[in-house]
Swiss-Prot record:
HAMAP family: MatK. Keywords: Chloroplast, mRNA processing, Plastid, RNA-binding, tRNA processing. GO terms for biological process: mRNA processing; RNA splicing; tRNA processing. It is found in: Plastid, Chloroplast. Belongs to the intron maturase 2 family. MatK subfamily. The keyword tRNA processing applies. Usually encoded in the trnK tRNA gene intron. Probably assists in splicing its own and other chloroplast group II introns. InterPro entries: Domain_X, Maturase_MatK, Maturase_MatK_N. The gene is matK. This is Maturase K. GO terms for molecular function: RNA binding. It comes from the Eukaryota.
């Protein structure tokens, strides 16, 4: 890592957050293209620079973009530059790719330095996607409302550029970024993010979008922290927590004697914030009036501070007891588990009804069947079909693919409260595998299974690694083992979502 810092000479650039000198490094563009540059690329037209500064790199790119614009104005019908033989936006795309590498360097250094610290071992477990579900089990059962907000996307390029102003101090880098963005996107908006990623450098776009999102989150979390320190009573006069500083001070000075014995009634609100796939999720124990206020805080913050148009209909409020939250491939909701306790005092006995709130996590079976149908494993009704594109592969490869998909889904959805949906997914993949092999050998499913025997699909029924470990700890038929199989299991080695799970 020290050699990497010396190679990029970051000590001088990072001291004042000056990134502009790094733009003139040839190897920055080699890093941007993963050393996949060939001799036809303009970066290697001058190979004698080595590790020296070369202002000709960016200057040549800018000049060619300027010459290219003149050619475009004279030949708008051509999608290919007739002189240079490159696409219209190639040169600005090259600058954008190099800039994407440069702006990620400071954050990469911070991440590496943090991972080498004392907290590295502790933070490893929190990298797993499943690590958030034990937190939800502990917290969500005590909350009342959940607020889901679709994060609006910037409608103008300047909004994305301005997100970098607070930590990039040199104006030259921002001017160059702004110039390349406007030239490359031709003043197009970013209203539709998926379409924009397809026409723009994905690495730089995601960095700019995340920087913009983190900026609004920092302001929101500041408001949330301020409101959490503002202690309120149940009086309707003090429901506005954002502007509570003066009220609390006035309350403490004037009514201190009257409320001295009741100050313990003040309590902090329970607010938890999560961002996931373009959504902001806010769960709270507050009343419906306060959660509605947070809804309008979201909309006003986006519209008046970040100049983002957001309709109030894009922000939904639901009660956790009546709503299932679609989150990370699970449908999470709060369920009441009733229980009856028999109590006896002297000669009198009576029954006590007790309901305990628990987090219920279920598999969104309809969405996963839709993903399996899109991947040609089944039809829209969930009936297994053959996978014709895999029919040319060897039998062992076909079986290995299906088994790997089945085990990955089983591993990811091990935290489901109800295993019936998981068994249905396994059934679809199992018979899709059989139909694919029968199609390859030009046979029927029944004849194919009769020929090979029932042990042919034993790969789908064999124990997973986790089940094997549990079977070593608990004896066969032990009650605790059956309870573990039926219960939820969260693993700390899942760092990405399966494509079939990521249905949205």
């Amino acid at each position: 890592m020290e050699e990497f810092q010396v190679y990029l000479e970051l000590n001088r650039s990072r001291r004042h957050d000056f990134l502009y000198p790094l733009i003139f490094r040839e190897y920055i563009y080699a890093l941007a293209h993963e050393h996949g540059l060939n001799k036809s690329m303009i970066f290697f037209e001058n190979q004698g620079y080595g590790n020296k500064f070369s202002s000709l790199i960016v200057k040549r790119l800018i000049l060619r973009m300027d010459q290219q614009n003149r050619l475009i104005s004279s030949a708008n019908d051509s999608n290919q530059n007739p002189v240079f033989g490159h696409n219209n936006n190639l040169y600005s795309q090259m600058i954008a790719a190099g800039f994407a590498v440069i702006v990620e360097i400071p954050f990469s250094l911070r991440l590496i330095s943090y991972s080498q610290g004392a907290e590295a071992a502790k933070s490893h477990n929190f990298q797993s996607i499943h690590s958030i579900f034990p937190f939800l089990e502990d917290k969500f059962s005590h909350l009342n409302y959940v607020l889901e907000a679709l994060i609006p996307h910037p409608i103008h390029l300047e909004i994305l550029v301005q997100a970098l102003r607070y930590w990039v101090k040199d104006a030259s880098s921002l001017h160059l970024l702004r110039f390349s963005l406007y030239e490359y996107c031709n003043l197009k908006s970013f209203i539709t993010p998926k379409k924009s990623i397809s026409i723009f450098n994905p690495r730089l776009f995601l960095f700019l979008y995340n920087s913009h999102t983190c900026e609004y989150e920092s302001i929101f979390l500041f408001l949330r922290n301020q409101s959490s320190h503002l202690r309120s009573t149940s009086s309707g006069v003090f429901l506005e927590r954002i502007f509570f500083y003066g009220k609390i001070k006035y309350l403490g000075e004037v009514f201190y004697n009257d409320f001295q014995n009741n100050l313990w009634l003040f309590k902090d609100p329970f607010i938890h914030f999560i961002r996931y796939q373009g959504k902001s999720i806010l769960a709270s124990k507050d009343t419906s009036l306060l959660i509605n206020k947070w809804k309008y805080y979201f909309v006003d913050l986006w519209q008046y501070y970040f100049y983002l148009w957001s309709q109030s209909g894009r922000v939904r409020i639901n009660q956790l007891s009546k709503y299932s939250l679609d989150f990370l491939g699970y449908l999470s909701s709060v369920r009441l588990n009733p229980s009856v306790v028999r109590s006896q005092m002297l000669e009198n006995s009576f029954l006590i009804d007790n309901a305990v709130k628990t987090l219920d996590t279920r598999i969104p079976i309809i969405s996963i069947i839709g993903s399996l149908s899109k991947a040609k494993f089944c039809n829209t009704l969930g009936h297994p079909i053959s996978k014709p594109t895999w029919a040319d592969s060897p039998d062992s490869d076909i079986i290995d693919r299906f088994v790997r998909i089945s085990r990955n889904l089983s591993h990811y959805h091990s935290g489901s409260s109800k295993k019936k949906s998981l068994y249905r997914i396994k059934y679809i993949l199992r018979f899709s595998c059989v139909k694919t092999l029968a199609r390859k050998h030009k046979s029927t499913v029944r004849a194919f299974l009769k020929k090979l025997g029932s042990e042919f699909l034993e790969e789908f029924f064999t124990e997973t690694e986790e089940e094997h470990v549990f079977s070593l700890i608990f004896p066969r038929g032990f009650f605790a083992l059956r309870k573990v199989y039926r219960g939820r299991i969260w693993y700390l080695d899942i760092i990405c979502i399966n494509a079939l799970v990521n249905h949205s």
